[in-house]
Amino acid sequence: MEVASQALGPLVTELYDVQAFKFGSFVLKSGLSSPVYIDLRGIVSRPRLLSQVADILFQTAKNAGISFDSVCGVPYTALPLATVICSANHIPMLIRRKETKDYGTKRLVEGEINPGQTCLVIEDVVTSGASVLETVEVLQKEGLKVTDAIVLLDREQGGKDKLQAQGIRLHAVCTLSQMLEILQQQEKIDADMVGRVKRFIQENVFSAANHNGLPPPEKKACKELSFGARAELPGTHPLASKLLRLMQKKETNLCLSADVSEARELLQLADALGPSICMLKTHVDILNDFTLDVMEELTALAKRHEFLIFEDRKFADIGNTVKKQYESGTFKIASWADIVNAHVVPGSGVVKGLQEVGLPLHRACLLIAEMSSAGSLATGNYTKAAVGMAEEHCEFVIGFISGSRVSMKPEFLHLTPGVQLETGGDHLGQQYNSPQEVIGKRGSDVIIVGRGILAAANRLEAAEMYRKAAWEAYLSRLAVQ
């Protein structure tokens, strides 16, 4: 049952006035450019408005006749809404974490859980329904029943149908169409803007699986942002912006994996292939003659040829230990490496430890979300945990080592190892994919190539072949509409 228009109209208008609803041109986390942007986070600083929104959400649940024992807000914007609802109406609340903490109870759901009881999910905005489903799945794993979700605004992009296909009824206080109608009547927006928003919504609907179990029709891909455009996004890390700009300028998304054992060869590779690459990946612990002077020379070459240095250290210990490994010891990695990487197995402490050293030096980190070796355990929930950790520490983490795109946020970079011009593998379990497969089909940004170049008779010629193949795959991906 819809909320009475006399209550809805003033609420929509006030939300517009406090800039919860914005119109213009905005880049969404999917990379799409949208004429409307909805951001309700600011209402936490407006207690009266926060209470109004919470009350209208609760009334919507009552009007729908929903029976429930507890309430859980989708993190993070819906958490304060759920808190106000539960406090005002004396209802038990559950809090869902985005990731398990490495201390305390280590639980994903906090609060008194009674398996078999029904939990009502609260959300601020629904687009595809994915965030609601993630919360539903976590609650169901705790033995709770979830049948309904209440949302303030349904963007009408397929989320309701997607949730319905999973047995979840979505009840919206307001739809995007209703919001547009109210704001146009109040002369907050004109007919042209209403038309632009409606066209955008119609062209970007997320399809749910059919009830007969068949997969949804293939959705037409939308043109994504170029490297240059991604560099200018307000949420892009400064070092990621630098990398994206030099990639655009040099027309290269090739990272050379310089796994050599002699410093002289490392420097020769950097000098000869520097113009063809955007990054040079090192394994300094395999250099027989490592010195900090060598790294000083490498840093000078990186500056001359405009590429970044990525030390493939794969940190995987507790925070205090990785901090020391990064900052001191024989290699003093933080003093010369622009970027390092880390496993997520130890929990967020590994990032926090690296961050304490790297942030003041304007360094950055990649998280290992997937690996190119046969039998890798970096899949499924492990990959999801890596994405969640990156989002939580985006001031230091700039992306992932992965076999494909694992996050739709254009601010994050994806680097893929195990690339050769021909697919295949080696006797130690390394699996190879082509640049077209990795960049064009799997949505990665940068290919990491080692043996395909190092084993070639003419390394510069081989590097140029990989550079061109990867860049052409990127351009082809941009051209898809």
UniProtKB/Swiss-Prot annotation:
Residues 215-220 are annotated as: Domain linker. It comes from Mus musculus (Mouse). The keyword NADP does not apply. The lineage of its organism: Eukaryota, Metazoa, Chordata, Craniata, Vertebrata. This is Uridine 5'-monophosphate synthase. Residues 1-214 are annotated as: OPRTase. Keywords: Decarboxylase, Glycosyltransferase, Lyase, Multifunctional enzyme, Phosphoprotein, Pyrimidine biosynthesis, Transferase. It comes from the Eukaryota. The gene is Umps. The modification Phosphotyrosine is found at residue 37.
